[in-house]
């Protein structure tokens, strides 16, 4: 009831505002609303609602149920116009959205009070049981936009004793294992503060059938997985189709536009016959595409479409305004030189996420930076799942500041060309037998914490890839920056990106500016050193580094599986930025002599350092935060002290014993 009241109140405010601004265009807007579907009877009210939603920043399209609810006359709208404008500018708290008290308590514990625009719009609609397609930029809060109403409904059913037990009640389908882990962690963190015992599990293709059966025993209320894994479970009889029809009440597709590009179309189609007609479906995406339209027609019934276009009154379509975009023109052979100058002369803020298009490029860059004393780690599809997750956690915990991530996704045209080539399809089957993980994905969905700078060492294959890469910084309204190194061969894709951003933001000038802190003198001062070191990194060195890194991470993965389930805070026991090369690093390469740094570059570097100090970025980390208490630990080890008591308790006991001895001595003396 509370959710319905909140949704109704919001709709009325929008309609009051819209009526004053759309009197002249009511006929045209009504025609647009009439074309949305034959079930829309309240054309004028629906048009007003669409106009109001667009003014606020969320474009809403819907079927029959979204029509003429709560229509008011022009006089009432005129009286409430200014009031509605003030109300819409006011932030909405989670308390106003009608969520369960347990969830509100969990949000308060996490320090969350205000809903983001996509949460403000999507949560009431999902609570009303409507199918929803929500499109919003990365970092806008889409995960909680579906987790909160989903958990609210399950908590309500659990309290009423109406949960069906034959199969999971909710499927959350995501394209990658990393995102699967992230969504599972977010849902679990909310349920920690709930008294109702709801169970959420994740399964993936790397698990054995036995482990999957154990995980699905019960069964759980919420299953987070990939389409390929759930389709495999159905085909093997681990999950029965009849049980899904009986129990499934909600299905959520996160990063929906990426699901089909990850070869999940057949898996999703195999799942469709088992989905009950009454199942509520939700699609979350950062972009619009033909794939979204295909999934919408396949799974949803008369959905509401929410497109987040603005936050307040500042246009903020694809790239947040708090993210500065820069580019540097350079030859492909000079890219390592430019990266060296940016990092060694400290012209960009840490933490830095560097994107490359191949694994060999990633290791070549890592070996190159090692020669200059710059430690980094590589995140790629060859690594074991546990190691990939641990690298992300360690990077988020600032155990190292530079992460090189491989983004192997090809453009849509290349995928279609390869799909029609039989020879290529045979090669892809061989590749599937190798160690590359088809469900690996680092660009989409993964929540990197406090990344300040994203560097496109290699340009992405398409504009959408650029948007998703840059979306790894500037999350949760924090400032960020992106720097793209553009070679002459990449000018075409760079122009496509610029044109897309111009069209979206309706600008004549470029949205991406030349990087202002880099001077020609700074680049030339390190050119000869960089060229000598780059030549020393051979193909053989790269292959050996890849082999050594995989060997190290396999050992790490086995340790991780046994240890970190019980000790999740001990993140720095394993180092992912160890030196890969066995060759001794020349001492003169670690530091840049003062005479090589020109005054302009030195001043720019000082500005970056002062900015970093003002943001408290370089505050020293305490070992205690990572699960270490310092000291030898002898006093608290019962095997070494023959005492199960801690140091403070024994100290108190000694003081009490000493006081008793003094009293005895006084009695004897008297």
From Swiss-Prot:
Gene Ontology molecular function terms on file: ATP binding; ATP hydrolysis activity; mRNA binding; RNA helicase activity
Residue span(s) of domain Helicase C-terminal: 340-523
Biased composition (Basic and acidic residues): 18-30, 40-49, 654-670
ATP-binding among keywords: yes
Motif extent (Q motif): 92-120
Recorded GO CC terms: nucleolus
Domain Helicase ATP-binding: 123-306
Annotated EC: 3.6.4.13
DEAD box (motif): residue ranges: 254-257
Keywords attached to this entry: ATP-binding, Helicase, Hydrolase, Nucleotide-binding, RNA-binding
Record InterPro entries: DEAD/DEAH_box_helicase_dom (IPR011545), DEAD_box_RNA_helicase (IPR050079), Helicase_ATP-bd (IPR014001), Helicase_C-like (IPR001650), P-loop_NTPase (IPR027417), RNA_helicase_DEAD_Q_motif (IPR014014)
Catalytic activity as recorded in UniProt: ATP + H2O = ADP + phosphate + H(+)
Biased composition (Low complexity): 1-10
Annotated CDD domains: DEADc_DDX56 (cd17961), SF2_C_DEAD (cd18787)
Pfam families: DEAD (PF00270), Helicase_C (PF00271)
Residues reported in the UniProt entry to bind ATP: 136-143
Segments for region (Disordered): 1-97, 616-670
Source domain of life: Eukaryota
Enzyme class per UniProt: hydrolase
Stated family: Belongs to the DEAD box helicase family. DDX56/DBP9 subfamily.
Domain observations: The Q motif is unique to and characteristic of the DEAD box family of RNA helicases and controls ATP binding and hydrolysis.
UniProt name for this protein: DEAD-box ATP-dependent RNA helicase 16
């Amino acid at each position: 009831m509370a959710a319905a009241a909140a949704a109704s109140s919001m709709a009325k405010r929008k309609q009051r505002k819209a009526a004053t601004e759309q009197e002249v265009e009511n006929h045209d807007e009504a025609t647009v609303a009439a074309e949305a579907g034959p079930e829309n009877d309240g054309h004028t009210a629906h048009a007003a609602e669409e106009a109001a939603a667009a003014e606020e920043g969320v474009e809403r399209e819907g079927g029959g149920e979204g029509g003429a609810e709560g229509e008011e006359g022009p006089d009432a709208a005129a009286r409430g116009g200014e009031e509605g404008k003030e109300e819409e500018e006011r932030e909405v708290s989670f308390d106003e959205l009608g969520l369960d008290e347990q969830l509100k308590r969990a949000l308060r514990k996490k320090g969350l009070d205000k809903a983001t625009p996509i949460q403000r719009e999507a949560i009431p609609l999902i609570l009303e049981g409507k199918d929803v397609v929500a499109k919003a930029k990365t970092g806008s809060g889409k995960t909680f936009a579906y987790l909160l109403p989903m958990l609210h409904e399950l908590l309500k059913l659990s309290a009423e004793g109406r949960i069906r037990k034959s199969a999971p009640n909710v499927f959350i389908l995501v394209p990658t294992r990393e995102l699967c882990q992230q969504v599972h962690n977010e849902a679990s963190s909310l349920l920690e503060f709930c008294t109702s015992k709801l169970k959420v599990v994740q399964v993936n293709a790397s698990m054995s059938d036995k482990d999957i059966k154990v995980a699905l025993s019960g069964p759980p209320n919420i299953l987070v997985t990939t389409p390929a894994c759930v389709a495999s479970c159905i085909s093997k009889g681990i999950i029965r189709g009849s049980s899904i029809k009986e129990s499934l009440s909600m299905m959520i597709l996160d990063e929906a536009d990426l699901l089909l590009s990850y070869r999940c179309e057949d898996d999703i189609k195999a799942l469709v016959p088992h989905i009950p007609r009454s199942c509520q479906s939700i699609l979350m995406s950062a972009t619009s595409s033909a794939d979204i339209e295909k999934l919408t027609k396949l799974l949803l019934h008369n959905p509401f479409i929410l497109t987040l276009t603005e936050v307040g009154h500042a246009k903020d379509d694809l790239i947040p305004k708090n993210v500065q975009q820069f580019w540097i023109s350079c030859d492909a052979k000079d890219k390592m030189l430019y990266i060296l100058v940016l990092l060694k002369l400290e012209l960009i803020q840490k933490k830095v996420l560097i994107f490359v298009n191949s694994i060999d490029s990633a290791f070549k860059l890592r070996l190159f930076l090692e020669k200059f004393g710059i430690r980094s780690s590589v995140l790629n599809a060859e690594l074991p799942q546990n190691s990939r997750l641990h690298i992300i956690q360690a990077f988020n915990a600032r155990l190292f500041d530079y992460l090189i991530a491989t983004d192997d996704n090809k453009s849509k045209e290349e995928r279609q060309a390869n799909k029609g080539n039989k020879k290529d399809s045979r090669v892809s089957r061989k590749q599937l037998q190798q160690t590359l993980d088809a469900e690996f994905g680092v660009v989409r969905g993964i929540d990197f914490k406090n990344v300040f700078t994203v560097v496109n060492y290699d340009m992405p294959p398409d504009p959408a890839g650029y948007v998703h890469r840059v979306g790894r910084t500037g999350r949760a309204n924090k400032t960020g920056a992106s720097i793209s190194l553009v070679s002459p061969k990449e000018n075409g894709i760079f122009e496509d990106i610029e044109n897309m951003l111009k069209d979206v933001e309706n600008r004549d000038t470029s949205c991406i500016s030349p990087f202002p802190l880099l001077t020609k003198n700074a680049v030339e001062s390190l050119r000869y050193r960089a060229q000598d070191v780059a030549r020393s990194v051979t193909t053989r060195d790269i292959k050996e580094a890849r082999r050594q890194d995989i060997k190290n991470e396999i050992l790490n993965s086995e340790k991780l599986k046994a240890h970190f389930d019980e000790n999740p805070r001990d993140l720095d026991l394993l180092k992912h930025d160890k030196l890969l090369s066995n060759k001794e690093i020349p001492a003169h390469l670690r530091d840049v002599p003062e005479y090589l740094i020109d005054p302009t570059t030195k001043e720019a570097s000082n500005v970056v350092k002062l900015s970093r100090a003002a943001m408290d970025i370089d505050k020293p980390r305490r070992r205690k935060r990572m699960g270490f208490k310092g000291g030898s630990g002898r006093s608290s080890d019962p095997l070494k002290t023959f005492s199960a008591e801690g140091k403070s308790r024994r100290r108190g006991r000694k003081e009490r014993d000493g006081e008793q001895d003094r009293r005895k001595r006084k009695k004897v003396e008297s």
